[in-house]
Amino acid sequence: HNAMPSPILKELAQVITNAGNDDEVKVIVLKSGGDRTFCAGASFKELIAIDNLEAGDLFFSGFANVINAMRTCGKIIIGRVQGKAVGGGVGLASATDYCLATKYAAIKLSEISIGIGPFVIEPAVSKKIGVTAFSQMTIDAENFYSAEYAKEKGLYANVFETIEELDQAVNELANKLASYNPEALSELKNVLWQNTENWDTLLKERAKISGKLVLSSFTKEKLASYK
């Protein structure tokens, strides 16, 4: 279900940073494989294996680093969300600059239900959909919210019936952006992410909170029941 293990998170952060520094790259499209799930968030297998604070901190820093790479990258990032997004997947969608989805792209913030919380992704999600929607979804942790809800709250700019229509819209937008003045787009990116300069520190602090909670006996028992 497109869960995100640490090596993939590390690679993703690096690829985004490199693309941001590459003059040949005009626009970035963030997408995932398959047609069922966009991103299921943290890898349960890895969460279960975390047995010390350092490992927990390191794991959750993976998502922090990707969000910070997206935020500081000088290129506009289009999100292509073809299926469900859970936890960290919602965080990645929120960190794009313009996100398009299919009607199957429901979202869920399930972290509280397994004993942790969406702390690393909160700044990105709250910035995109507002604190009210974020807190509602976080507290109502076991329910999916529809793609229409996500559009209503501003996560998705548009929702399509099929993946084919989604891809057509993504390609059209990417081509359009590629024809615009790259300097203007770079300035736009700066403006869109103004006042997030403290996120380098903030998201690392949030990763520490999640890293600590994943070691709690409550969370350990909860995760063990999913084995």
What residue ranges belong to the model's regions?
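Conserved CoA-thioester-binding segment of acyl-CoA-metabolizing enzymes
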Residues: 1-31, 68
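Crotonase-fold acyl-CoA enzyme core
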Residues: 69-180
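Acidic-histidine catalytic/liganding microenvironments
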Residues: 22, 50, 73-74
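Charged catalytic carboxylate motif
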Residues: 7-11, 62, 69, 169, ...
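Terminal peptide-recognition signature
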Residues: 11-12, 30, 43, 76, ...
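C-terminal alpha-helix plus adjacent terminal tail
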Residues: 22, 35, 141-149, 163-227
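Glycine- (often His-adjacent) and acidic-residue-rich active-site loop
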Residues: 32-66, 85
